[in-house]
């Protein structure tokens, strides 16, 4: 995890911030770089050497139609498996580079990242071996997120961990892609050619953590690739990394944290719980102290620093806030919580849920701000001492407002989630306005100006059921479009108090309308990838066509954890 103790310098002058801000905004006019394909390297224990690319190409021509051939597709034909072992590594550097934690003080060019990957892999493997021996680990989970944000994993015996780090872990592609809903059997897609193929889970070793709530087990978060070494274009984590790279190319870095609501029930209380609830009640926060202490302590040991927790507004509902971190770490923390909270709950014979059957939806707020690449200057902070965003902040906010309809499709991905947008209205509407304000928790986009470190935008469009990687990626994509746009806030001076909107933005209440908005949003389609948008829309349309209202709550209760 990154040490963000020195995120900002209080003595940075306003003039310096404005001058650097202008130069960074100018970078946004450049053509976006293409994301390069991952490269292959090889390892012999702790000694890492570059593999001959032609040899690797020949090794990758195994007949995948034969049973069992996929598991050994690139090394059975190698001359010496100990000296020439292929490793699939992503070429994305900086905040999302495999085996490289984000350091805002480092020049993260693609060439530098590639040259650093090999020695870092050796160093991390040595450290991980020591951790495994110290904790007497028996298993390591190789985890990846599917489109729903559900963790899909394979557990590997500890003695095979290094081999799987080098070779990768194979998993059917259908597990992570077009799943109509998490409870459907994957064999429904057996006739689709792409679902008969395997993908490769390649671990990002910086995410290796011992799981306190699992017996002698660790986990590592993985990036997903095809068997030929191509990034899986539907991978939410890959999409988030790609957007963070685009943000860095523009001269900025993302500091963010998720705020999650979740509900805890005893098994008999799952339906129609009568639990009394008072927001931030000390008595309710301490109602089951051992459970919350184990959860928070466990999250800390997995690298997710919890800033606070409290009771929330609904029966049995708790709120948990993470500390802000740079790069992909905030989404990794949220991904860890989604699985960890239920695993800890089961130890206490509880059920943890992000959405429950009574119809209200837990929120998944992304609190974020944009900093310079060095991580020392908050580009949203005006320094005026009043509730005001900089020009960069106004343009970023304008982008979120502009794309709010499409964003809501990704951030409230189920019918129940969309009910929260009109919970205070009794009128039947097709859409509601996208609201924003300063220090107003009722708004969809809440701007908080609490000093330099605390000047941020809370994106409250999100439901806790949404995939955190998609929430982060879509937020960055919309914000970047706002920075590039010459409309709205771009026409204002930095001293203006009001954010000009050419057209009022609306959030559709029906899932069908939200899907249409996403399909029509050319900016998000380009940023997130047409392949991903096509898969996501197809999945949601299938759900709508086969919707079982009575079962929806149970689906979320059991799987969206």
Swiss-Prot record:
Residues 1-78, 91-112 are annotated as: Disordered. Residues 135-229 form the GS beta-grasp domain. Expressed in lens. GO terms for molecular function: catalytic activity. Disulfide bonds: none annotated. GO terms for cellular component: cytoplasm; membrane; plasma membrane. Residues 236-561 form the GS catalytic domain. InterPro entries: Gln_synt_N, Gln_synt_N_sf, Gln_synth/guanido_kin_cat_dom, Gln_synth_cat_dom. Residues 26-37 have a biased composition (Basic residues). Residues 50-63 have a biased composition (Polar residues). May act as a component of the cytoskeleton or as a chaperone for the reorganization of intermediate filament proteins during terminal differentiation in the lens. Does not seem to have enzymatic activity. Dodecamer. Interacts with BFSP2 and VIM. Belongs to the glutamine synthetase family. This is Lengsin. It comes from Rattus norvegicus (Rat).
């Amino acid at each position: 995890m990154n040490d963000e103790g020195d995120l900002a310098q209080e003595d940075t002058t306003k003039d310096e911030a404005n001058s650097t801000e202008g130069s960074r905004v100018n970078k946004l006019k450049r053509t976006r770089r293409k994301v390069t394909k991952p490269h292959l390297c090889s390892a012999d224990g702790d000694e890492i050497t570059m593999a001959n690319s032609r040899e690797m190409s020949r090794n990758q021509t195994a007949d995948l139609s034969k049973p069992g051939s996929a598991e050994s597709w690139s090394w059975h034909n190698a001359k010496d498996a100990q000296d020439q072992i292929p490793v699939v590594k992503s070429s994305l550097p900086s905040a999302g580079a495999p085996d490289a934690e984000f350091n805002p003080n480092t020049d993260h060019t693609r060439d530098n990242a590639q040259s650093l990957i090999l020695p870092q892999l050796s160093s991390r493997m040595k450290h991980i071996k020591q951790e495994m021996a110290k904790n007497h680990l028996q298993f390591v989970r190789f985890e990846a997120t599917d489109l729903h944000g559900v963790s899909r994993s394979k557990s590997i015996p500890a003695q095979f961990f290094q081999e799987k780090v080098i070779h990768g872990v194979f998993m059917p592609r259908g597990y992570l892609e077009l799943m109509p809903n998490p409870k459907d059997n994957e064999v429904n897609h057996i006739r689709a050619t792409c679902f008969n193929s395997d993908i490769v889970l390649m671990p990002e070793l910086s995410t290796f953590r011992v799981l306190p709530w699992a017996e002698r087990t660790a986990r590592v978060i993985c990036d997903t690739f095809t068997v030929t070494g191509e990034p899986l274009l539907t991978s939410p984590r890959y999409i988030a990394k790609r957007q963070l790279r685009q943000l860095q190319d523009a001269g900025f870095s993302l500091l963010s944290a998720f705020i999650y609501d979740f509900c805890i029930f005893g098994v008999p209380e799952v339906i129609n719980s009568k639990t009394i609830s008072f927001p931030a009640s000390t008595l309710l926060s301490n109602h089951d102290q051992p459970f919350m202490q184990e959860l928070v302590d466990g999250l800390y040991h997995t690298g997710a620093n919890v800033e606070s927790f409290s009771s929330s507004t609904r029966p049995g509902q708790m709120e948990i806030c993470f500390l802000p971190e740079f790069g992909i770490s905030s989404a990794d923390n949220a991904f860890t919580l989604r699985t960890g909270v239920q695993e800890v709950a089961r130890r206490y014979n509880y059920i943890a849920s992000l959405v429950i059957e009574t119809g209200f939806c837990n929120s998944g707020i992304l609190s974020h701000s944009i900093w310079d690449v060095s991580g020392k200057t908050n580009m949203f902070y005006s320094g005026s001492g009043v509730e005001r965003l900089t020009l960069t902040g106004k343009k970023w906010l304008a982008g979120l407002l502009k794309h709010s309809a499409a964003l809501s499709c990704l951030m409230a991905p189920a019918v129940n989630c969309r009910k929260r947008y009109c919970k205070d209205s009794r009128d039947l509407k097709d859409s509601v306005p996208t609201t924003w304000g300063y220090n107003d928790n009722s708004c969809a986009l809440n701007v908080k100006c609490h000093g330099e470190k605390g000047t941020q935008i809370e994106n409250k469009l999100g439901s806790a059921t949404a995939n955190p990687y998609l929430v982060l990626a879509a937020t960055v994509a919309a914000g970047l479009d706002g920075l590039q746009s010459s409309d709205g806030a771009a026409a204002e001076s930095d001293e203006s108090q009001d954010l000009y909107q050419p057209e009022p933005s609306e959030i559709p209440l029906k899932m069908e309308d939200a899907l249409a908005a996403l399909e029509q949003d050319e900016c998000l389609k380009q940023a997130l990838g047409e392949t991903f948008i096509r898969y996501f829309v197809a999945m949601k349309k299938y759900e709508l066509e086969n919707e079982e209202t009575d079962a929806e709550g149970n689906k979320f209760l059991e799987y969206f954890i």
